[in-house]
Amino acid sequence: MSEFSLVLDDIQKSYNHGKANEINVLRGASTRIARGEIVGLIAPSGAGKSTLLQIAGLLDTADAGRVEIGGELVTGATDRARTAARRGKVGFVYQFHHLLPEFSAVENIVLPQLAHGVAAGEAEARALDLLGRVGMAARATHRPGELSGGEQQRVAFCRSLANAPALMLADEPTGNLDPATSDTVFDVLMELVRGTGLSALIATHNHELAARMDRVLRLDEGVLVSA
C-alpha cells in the first residue's frame, strides 16, 4: 500500500487554450499527502483552489501532470476506471451540504453505499456508526429540513465517508456557517478525519482553521507552496 493518499505531480490546467483570453490556472502544482495527514489549502478567490480539488477528485482532468489516489495511477485511466476510483477512494464535502431533502440523515449515508454494492444491513450499520461519531445518532431519522445548518453539515461529513475512502476533499466545508457554529463543526470534522485515519485536503479562507491542520499549502500563481 502506498504511503501517500494523494500525489499531484506537475498539474497544469488552462481555460480557453490557444485563444487570446487564455487563462492559466494551474502551472505545475505538485504535492504529496501522506496517509492520515490533514492539509489545508488557502488562496484568494479565483486562484484555482476549486479547480485543483476537482482534478484531485477526478471530477475534471488536467492538461498535463500526474494524479495518484491511494497508490493508484489515475492519469490516463478510462472513464469507467476514473468513476470507480472516485466513488471508492474519494469523499467530497462542499460549502453547501447537497443532502437529498426527501431522505433522512441515515438514508443519505446509506444510499451511496448501496450504489457501491454494499448490502443494506451493512450500509445502515456504517451510517449509524458515522452519525454516532459526530453526535448525530439521535437525529438519524430526521430529514435535512428538520436539522440546523451545523447538523446538516455533520451529516454531509458522514456521507463523504460512506464508502470508506482513502481521501477527503473539502471545499470551504464551514463557509456557509456562522463563526461560532463553524468552529464547532470544524472540530467535529477534524475528530472524524482523525478517528477514521484517512487523509484530507481542506480548502478554506479561514487562516485560523487552516493553522490547526498538519500543514498548510498556498496556491501562488498556479503553483503549490508552503504557507
From Swiss-Prot:
SMART domains named in the record: AAA
Membrane-protein topology: Peripheral membrane protein
Pfam family, one: ABC_tran
Compartments in which it is found: Cell inner membrane
Nucleotide-binding recorded as keyword: yes
Any one annotated GO CC term: plasma membrane
Record keywords, A-Z: ATP-binding, Cell inner membrane, Cell membrane, Membrane, Nucleotide-binding, Translocase, Transport
Subunit and partners: The complex is composed of two ATP-binding proteins (LolD) and two transmembrane proteins (LolC and LolE).
Similarity comment: Belongs to the ABC transporter superfamily. Lipoprotein translocase (TC 3.A.1.125) family.
Chain's role: Part of the ABC transporter complex LolCDE involved in the translocation of mature outer membrane-directed lipoproteins, from the inner membrane to the periplasmic chaperone, LolA. Responsible for the formation of the LolA-lipoprotein complex in an ATP-dependent manner.
Protein's recorded name: Lipoprotein-releasing system ATP-binding protein LolD
Organism: Jannaschia sp. (strain CCS1)
Lineage: Bacteria, Pseudomonadati, Pseudomonadota, Alphaproteobacteria, Rhodobacterales
Gene: lolD
